[in-house]
């Protein structure tokens, strides 16, 4: 290799050495005239402008040769940095000669920058800050900030103007020869070429002593070429290539999603990974996945080669490689052993929360599709209609241990967002267990009494009884560990054949489940046992049928089992529940036929009645009794009521064994609205602009739609599709911003010692409970002890964790407000403490120090974002203002924007004396008489008032319906009230859409929103007025000054 060292090819002048140098060696262009760096001149705020105290516009005129700037005023009446036009410059030159100096372009700016005395500027600015106010003060703070940064870093301001431009190595701006002798090249080469050409031309012009105006023009063009190279399009029109496409400059190579950082450094492709279509693997255990053999051979290739050599099945690595390529028998045997105990990671994009990547143990399967356990589909939000997933192999022992201990799918049973099971049976598994636990009166063999489960099984197999038959069984024959009382054990228990089989899959000492109630999860009621000598058939004749176990109840069972037995037993139960569900749903033969969609006799009558009501409303409008918007509102309400009536009647007419009804009732698939559209009426549709159309679709899918109805229907359907696509992108972007804000919030210590807390009560919307007190206090630490109001018994002590049992007792005692430790009142710097956070929702245990709760919070809020609606409700202007809901409302809150449909907040406590309407400018004026002063507020005429004349109102309350602005709340009240408001508002949006999120996640985000303070008066600290800083730094600065005696 050394043989050719230093030799240069005499044909093309290239050194003979390794090709790697094409990625390392840089060149440079020595410029014939300095050029300003566009980042420092055009950035916001303009760094050059701040250092020189010139406006960016003036700077631009100088740099691009439109004006002269005075660099040395000498003994003239001019001042430094004064701008002169061409004409003024000539006149002054004629008048003063060489007594002053002025220049143009980056050269002049470079001179000005080198004249700046940084130390002196710092002293002057600090003096200015003591007296300046308003905008002057803001400007001074900004200048001081940047000049101090220059002083601290040791950089010189004149370095913002370049004399030399570096050229990046050739391999980073490649040039490729295409067929036909043409070349494809990186845009950077074009941009560099422009700079070189203009620089060479300028050099030549300078050597020829060309006229000043030509040189100036060439310098300006060089400046523009350098600008385009660094950041094309930042100033003026971008330089374009063929087909009018803007060229990609150095800045574009770095920034954005496709830039160097996000695309290539954070988003590298990794080896030992693959992707394939996924298919369902009902035969798998909870922590397994099916890996196709060809994929396994490729992913585990080095491991297989090592093992082949180790077992002497191949002489060396090369021979082992050949064996693998030939698919030898030996290789298959070795593969089985290699993948044993070696977990792999499965990921499905988009990875919205941490359950989007989980670890599994691979099991070899035939075919080319990876097999996924049906219960983890919900966490991945995967289905099997062609979804693909990526697989990664952890290589090092540490990575494998981490995958096994922390990421194995069997351990992720609860969702981090709300602590409810995310691994729960769905679809076939639900319908199977629903069918199994259904009871029917009068089925064959009803009232038979059996000795034990085996006898029941034999009777069922020989068709003496049906799964739905209600029977009796000797309780003593059931597992001795079941928590029956001694009296219950001595009696006969009433249950159904299916429920007996279902209870077989539960842990041995779990209560026998006979009815889907919360109480039955803890103990079985005495009413299911026969009195000695009682006739079972007579008892059954008067006993109503118990409902079957639906999806929600199966989830409750899992949650209860997880609480008592933790991970291992729960994952075993889940597998048993899955197998039983698949078996029984297959045996049940449930299906959907056109006969299941029954006609509704009362429909024509309901529709006719609605038409009459609409005609009446239209008549009232024509007579001028109501406005157009009122007419529209009423018509919409009439048709909605008609649809609701039809739905109600359909439910009444349902046969309990109707297959579609069973699917919807069990929670397996579909809901009552789907059924209404099949058998009732399609209802109102949204127009493309989001407004609801007055003409409903009266037909249902069974009858078939008319052409016009079909046209309306496609309108609504298309809007739904576009909304979903937009929502996904919006929600993903919101998650990214939330993570960005909260990623450094980590549990730092056990107890911060905070003596403050947050008073919580149920979140209400009118009379509707949005989030109960039980949910809000569960898994939190109490800040103050809670006592039973009647007896005075202590329910929970100070700094004690509120468990399910304690929370239940608090609710039963009738307590409505509890003071809890909260992230809002936590004193921990750069994070939260264990006590202020409480329970980790994903494990059900107290959170551990080091847990990244900020990221979990951001993911928990962002992940359900796709389920929120996109629309701002267009009410047709009836309620005055359109209210923002769904995802846009959540973004509005977290970005602290001025809300749409703003509610006015009163700044005084007092009485509403008058509400006057001004029809001329369509406003209302509300006057409030406080104790010391009177305030008048102007509201739009269409506002819905929350107060009337004579009402007493407190400071910080709203006068009209709508969303309060958090920025106003913080001014009128305090930070705690603002943080509380953010939690309430975000919860309202999510809960209205049926999405449950734990308060603590929103608290973490709200705390981050209010972390920064702006220094108004620095006092005796070293802080600069107007600077934004972290509240912890602010406290430290104050404490430090106090300790020094300030």
UniProtKB/Swiss-Prot annotation:
It holds the Pfam family RNA_pol_Rpb1_2. InterPro entries: DNA-dir_RpoC_beta_prime, DNA-dir_RpoC_beta_prime_bact, RNA_pol_asu, RNA_pol_N, RNA_pol_Rpb1_1, RNA_pol_Rpb1_3, RNA_pol_Rpb1_3_sf, RNA_pol_Rpb1_4. It catalyses: RNA(n) + a ribonucleoside 5'-triphosphate = RNA(n+1) + diphosphate. Its cofactor is Mg(2+); Zn(2+). GO terms for molecular function: DNA binding; DNA-directed RNA polymerase activity; metal ion binding. Keywords: DNA-directed RNA polymerase, Magnesium, Metal-binding, Nucleotidyltransferase, Transcription, Transferase, Zinc. One of its GO terms (biological process) is DNA-templated transcription. Zn(2+) binds at residues 752, 826, 833, 836. It comes from the Bacteria. GO terms for cellular component: DNA-directed RNA polymerase complex. Binds 1 Mg(2+) ion per subunit. Binds 1 Zn(2+) ion per subunit. Its EC number is 2.7.7.6. Mg(2+) binds at residues 383, 385, 387. The keyword Transport does not apply. DNA-dependent RNA polymerase catalyzes the transcription of DNA into RNA using the four ribonucleoside triphosphates as substrates. The RNAP catalytic core consists of 2 alpha, 1 beta, 1 beta' and 1 omega subunit. When a sigma factor is associated with the core the holoenzyme is formed, which can initiate transcription. Belongs to the RNA polymerase beta' chain family. This is DNA-directed RNA polymerase subunit beta'. It comes from Weissella hellenica. The lineage of its organism: Bacteria, Bacillati, Bacillota, Bacilli, Lactobacillales. The gene is rpoC.
């Amino acid at each position: 290799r050394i043989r050719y060292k230093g030799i240069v090819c005499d044909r093309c002048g290239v050194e003979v050495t390794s090709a790697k140098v094409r990625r390392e060696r840089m060149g440079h262009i020595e410029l014939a005239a300095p050029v300003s760096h566009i980042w420092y001149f055009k950035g916001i705020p303009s760094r050059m402008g701040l250092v020189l105290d010139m406006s960016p516009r003036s700077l631009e005129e100088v740099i691009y040769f439109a004006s002269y700037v005075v660099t040395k005023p000498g003994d003239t009446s001019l001042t430094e940095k004064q701008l002169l036009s061409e004409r003024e410059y000539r006149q002054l030159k004629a008048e003063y000669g060489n007594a002053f100096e002025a220049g143009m372009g980056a050269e002049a700016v470079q001179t000005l920058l080198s004249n700046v005395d940084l130390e002196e500027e710092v002293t002057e600015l600090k003096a200015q800050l003591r007296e300046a106010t308003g905008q002057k003060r803001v400007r001074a703070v900004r200048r001081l900030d940047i000049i101090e940064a220059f002083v601290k870093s040791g950089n010189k301001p004149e370095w913002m103007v370049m004399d030399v431009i570096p050229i990046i190595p050739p391999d980073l701006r490649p040039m490729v020869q295409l067929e036909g002798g043409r070349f494809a090249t990186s845009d950077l080469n074009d941009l560099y070429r422009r700079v070189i050409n203009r620089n060479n031309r300028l050099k030549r012009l300078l050597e020829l002593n060309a006229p000043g105006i030509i040189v100036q023009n060439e310098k300006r063009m060089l400046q523009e070429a350098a600008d385009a190279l660094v950041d094309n399009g930042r100033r003026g029109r971008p330089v374009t290539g063929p087909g009018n496409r803007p060229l990609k400059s150095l800045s574009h190579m770095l920034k954005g999603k496709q830039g160097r950082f996000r695309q290539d450094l954070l988003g590298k492709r990794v080896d030992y990974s693959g992707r394939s279509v996924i298919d369902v693997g009902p035969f798998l255990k909870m922590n397994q996945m099916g890996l196709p053999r060809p994929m396994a051979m490729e992913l585990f290739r080095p491991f297989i080669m090592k093992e082949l050599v180790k077992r002497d099945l191949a002489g060396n690595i090369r021979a082992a490689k050949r064996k693998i390529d030939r698919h030898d028998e030996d290789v298959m045997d070795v593969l089985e052993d290699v993948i044993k105990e070696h977990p792999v990671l499965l990921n499905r994009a988009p990875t919205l929360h941490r359950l989007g990547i989980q670890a599994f143990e691979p099991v070899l399967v035939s075919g080319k599709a990876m097999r996924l356990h049906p219960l983890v589909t919900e966490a991945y939000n995967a289905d099997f209609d062609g979804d693909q997933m990526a697989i990664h192999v952890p290589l090092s022992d540490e990575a494998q241990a981490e995958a096994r201990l922390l990421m194995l799918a069997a351990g992720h049973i609860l969702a981090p967002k709300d602590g409810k099971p995310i691994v729960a049976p769905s679809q076939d598994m639900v319908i199977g267990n629903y069918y199994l636990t259904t009871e029917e009166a009068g089925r064959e063999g009803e009232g038979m009494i059996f000795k034990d489960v085996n006898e029941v099984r034999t009777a069922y197999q020989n068709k003496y009884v049906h799964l739905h038959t209600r029977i009796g069984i000797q309780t003593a024959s059931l597992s001795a560990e079941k928590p029956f009382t001694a009296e219950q054990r001595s009696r006969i228990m009433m249950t159904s054949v299916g429920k007996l089989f279902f209870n077989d899959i539960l842990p041995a000492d779990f209560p026998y489940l006979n009815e889907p109630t919360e109480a039955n999860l803890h103990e079985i009621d005495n009413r299911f046992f026969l009195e000695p000598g009682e006739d079972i058939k007579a008892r059954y004749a008067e006993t109503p049928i118990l409902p079957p176990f639906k999806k929600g109840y199966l989830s409750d069972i899992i949650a209860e089992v997880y609480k008592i037995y933790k991970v291992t037993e729960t994952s075993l139960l889940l597998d048993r529940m899955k197998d039983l569900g698949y078996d029984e749903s297959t045996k049940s033969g449930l299906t959907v036929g056109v006969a299941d969609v029954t006609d509704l006799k009362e429909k024509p009558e309901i529709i006719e009645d609605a038409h009459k009501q609409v005609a009446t409303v239209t008549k009232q409008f024509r007579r001028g009794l109501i406005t157009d918007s009122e007419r529209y509102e009423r018509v919409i309400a009439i048709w909605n009521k008609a649809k609701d009536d039809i739905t109600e009647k359909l439910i009444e007419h349902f046969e309990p064994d109707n297959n579609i009804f069973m699917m919807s009732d069990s929670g397996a698939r579909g809901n009552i609205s789907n059924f209404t559209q099949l058998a009732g009426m399609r209802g109102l549709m949204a127009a493309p602009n989001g407004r609801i159309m007055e003409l409903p679709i009266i037909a249902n899918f069974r009858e078939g739609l008319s052409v016009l109805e079909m046209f309306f229907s496609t309108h609504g359907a298309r809007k739904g599709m576009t909304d979903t696509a937009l929502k996904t992108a919006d929600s993903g972007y919101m998650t990214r911003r939330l993570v960005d804000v909260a990623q450094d919030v980590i549990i730092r210590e056990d107890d911060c010692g905070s003596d403050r807390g947050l008073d919580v009560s149920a979140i209400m919307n009118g009379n509707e409970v949005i989030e109960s007190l039980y949910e809000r206090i569960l898994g939190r630490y109490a800040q103050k002890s809670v006592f039973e109001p009647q007896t005075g018994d202590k329910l929970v002590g100070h700094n004690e964790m509120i468990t399910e049992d304690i929370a239940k007792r608090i609710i039963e005692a009738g307590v409505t407000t509890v003071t809890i430790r909260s992230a809002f009142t936590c004193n921990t710097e750069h994070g939260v403490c264990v006590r202020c956070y409480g329970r980790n929702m994903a494990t059900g245990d107290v959170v551990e120090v080091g847990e990244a709760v900020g990221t979990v919070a951001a993911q928990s809020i962002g992940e359900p974002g796709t389920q929120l609606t996109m629309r701002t409700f267009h009410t047709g202007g009836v309620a005055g203002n359109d209210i923002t809901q769904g995802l846009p409302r959540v973004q509005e809150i977290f970005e602290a924007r001025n809300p749409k449909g703003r509610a006015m907040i009163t700044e005084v406590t007092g009485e509403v004396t008058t509400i006057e309407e001004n029809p001329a400018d369509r406003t209302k004026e509300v006057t409030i008489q406080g104790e010391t002063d009177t305030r008048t507020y102007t509201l739009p005429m269409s506002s819905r008032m929350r107060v009337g004349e004579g009402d007493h109102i407190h400071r910080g309350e709203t006068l009209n319906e709508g969303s309060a602005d958090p920025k106003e709340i913080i001014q009128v009240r305090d930070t705690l009230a603002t943080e509380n408001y953010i939690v309430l508002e975000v919860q309202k949006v999510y809960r209205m859409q049926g999405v449950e999120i734990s308060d603590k996640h929103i608290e973490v985000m709200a705390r981050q929103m209010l972390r920064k303070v702006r220094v108004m008066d620095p006092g005796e600290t070293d802080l600069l007025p107007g600077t934004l800083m972290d509240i912890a730094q602010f406290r430290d600065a104050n404490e430090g000054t106090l300790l020094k005696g300030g």
